[in-house]
Amino acid sequence: MKKLMIIILAVLFLISCNHEYQGVPESYHKLLDIAIEQAGDNAEEIKKAISESPAEQKEGMAFLISYMPERDLTSLGADFLLENVEYAYRAREEFSWCKNLPDSIFFNEVLPYANTSEDRDPWRKDFYERFSLIVKDCENIVDAIYTINKPINTEVKVEYDTRRSRVDASPKQSMEEHMATCTGLSMILTDAFRSVGIPSRLAGTGMWTNMKGNHTWSEVWVDGEWM
């Protein structure tokens, strides 16, 4: 009888563990355990983000949380994460160039909610609503890239200006100040690309060879290559 009770308890434990991450690939389970522990007082928000994700978005949410900086684990709310993931998957469903991306590219270069150390503002829904209209008639990713890049300063009303309040300003901050330097402008462009399913990331140089300043720019992933 004692042995039977041990077996039953073990089975119940396994079922409860599986239920917590139901629909999430097993390869993420240990990573999520670590992330939830690191989240501390914010753990319930992280758990809520996982549990309330639709089935088709579970892996994307698990990926974000598994590799999230600790500062975000302890501060980001479930609603922020759920909205970010929802609109990333909307872009994947809507635009052919995003639908056909490998998961590794989608997870790393479309799904993220931030680039570097900028404030974690909820930009994705706003940018999706702005830029999906601009690229809705584009036939391919190259056309979409040029279609966004050309009018973006006018769309967000941000110009290059070294009087900006901080180098790593978030898109929201830059749009409120109507100014940014190369880093802030590149974050806006990268997030605009990501909002419509175009894989994008920041690139840069810490110092030019003539020792006269640095630079940041946006790269895009087209046909298997970074440009």
Language model regions located:
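A generic structural signal for short, solvent-exposed coil/turn residues
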Residues: 9, 38-40, 192, 210
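Hydrophobic/aromatic-rich core segments of domains that either
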Residues: 139, 144, 150, 162-172, ...
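Sec-dependent N-terminal signal peptides
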Residues: 4-13
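The N-terminal extracellular segments of secreted preproproteins, especially immediately downstream
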Residues: 12-16, 181
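N-terminal accessory/pre-domain segments preceding catalytic cores
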Residues: 17-161, 174, 195, 222-227
